[in-house]
């Protein structure tokens, strides 16, 4: 079999800044993605500037204003302990979108949901690439284990993991990564099975490149489009899962302003005519997930047009 000199020498790669510029142009050209970006950007702004946009702290209590409706003093009302709901939403947005709290005195940038998705991407992409490129018994063994994990309902799997390792921000990250790994691995495997048949992969094999070089330098970058879109969707799913775990009492431990825990604490007062403590965090979760899904849908739609 003959391979052209250009194929053997490899494909000329587009400079990174041009790839970034093209991605930004795709994002900015989509009205759907821009609508989602505005929603997510609003909550990111609220999370970053939480200490400056409210005169209260998330744990400050006013026993004279328990379950108070929205007013000039408390724009979204208060919960059953007299804590300002807007303040708690703002500080909750910090955990959801800005920082990952390790303990009371230490935190790292980038949010709980994103760390979980990134960890799942690393593990899932590695397993998917190895399975697709190596094939045989390795592929069968890895995929059957992941299929067994996917047989569990997602929320049940989250509950099993958190119940086993305990509830904390770091453990929620691990749970998000574990639950997301099978789906990511199957996506990457399907993309890699298609890409590994391309001429430039055969050219790399003829050049004698290391299998890991082929997997992570030749195959993975050419699968990045669908992976990025899937990752954005998974961040939304992870935020929804964090809210569900908080509602079930398995989320971030108190006194964290966990949106799911806020819904759980306020639901008992809905029928008594005080829905505010449950209503606003529910809308916050819904709006954020919708915003992320709009970004992913817009990117997917515009990427298809550019192909």
What are these regions (language model features)?
Residues 98-123, 212-245, 292:
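Transmembrane alpha-helices
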Residues 83-95, 135-139, 143, 193-197, ...:
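Amphipathic cytosolic juxtamembrane alpha-helices at the membrane-cytosol interface
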Residues 23-28, 56-114, 264-282:
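Periplasmic/extracellular loop-to-transmembrane helix junction in inner-membrane transport proteins
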Residues 161-164, 176, 191-192, 233-234, ...:
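Glycine-rich helix-loop "coupling/hinge" segments at transmembrane-helix boundaries
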Residues 162, 169, 179, 225, ...:
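C-terminal transmembrane helix and the adjacent membrane-cytosol boundary/short C-terminal tail
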Residues 2-4, 38, 46-81, 248-257:
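Hydrophobic alpha-helical transmembrane segments of membrane transport/permease proteins
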Residues 75, 79, 85, 107-110, ...:
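Generic hydrophobic transmembrane alpha-helix motif, especially the helices
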Residues 1-38, 294-307:
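Transmembrane alpha-helical segments of polytopic membrane transport and secretion proteins
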């Amino acid at each position: 079999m003959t391979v052209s000199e250009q194929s053997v020498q490899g494909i000329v790669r587009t400079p990174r800044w041009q790839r970034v510029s093209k991605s930004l142009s795709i994002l900015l050209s989509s009205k759907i993605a821009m609508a989602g970006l505005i929603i997510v950007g609003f909550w990111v702004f609220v999370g970053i500037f939480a200490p400056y946009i409210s005169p209260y702290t998330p744990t400050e209590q006013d026993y004279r204003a328990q379950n108070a409706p929205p007013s000039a003093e408390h724009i979204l009302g208060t919960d059953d302990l007299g804590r300002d709901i807007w303040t708690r939403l703002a500080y909750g947005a910090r955990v959801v979108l800005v920082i990952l709290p390790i303990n009371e005195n230490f935190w790292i940038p980038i949010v709980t949901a994103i760390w979980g998705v990134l960890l799942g991407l690393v593990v899932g992409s590695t397993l998917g690439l190895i399975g697709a490129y190596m094939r045989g018994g390795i592929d069968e063994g890895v995929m059957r284990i992941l299929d067994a994990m996917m047989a569990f309902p997602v929320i049940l799997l989250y509950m099993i993991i958190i119940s086993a390792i305990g509830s904390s921000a770091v453990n929620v990250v691990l749970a998000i990564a574990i639950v997301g790994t099978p789906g990511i691995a199957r996506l990457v495997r399907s993309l890699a099975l298609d890409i590994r048949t391309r001429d430039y992969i055969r050219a790399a094999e003829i050049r004698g490149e290391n299998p890991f070089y082929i997997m992570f330098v030749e195959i993975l970058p050419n699968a990045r489009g669908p992976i990025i879109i899937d990752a954005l969707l998974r961040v939304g799913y992870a935020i929804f899962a964090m809210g569900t775990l908080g509602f079930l009492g398995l989320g971030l431990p108190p006194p964290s302003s966990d949106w799911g825990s806020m819904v759980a604490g306020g639901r008992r007062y809905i029928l008594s005519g005080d829905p505010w403590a449950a209503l606003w965090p529910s809308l916050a979760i819904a709006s954020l997930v919708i915003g992320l899904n709009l970004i992913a849908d817009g990117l997917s739609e515009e990427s298809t047009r550019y192909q």
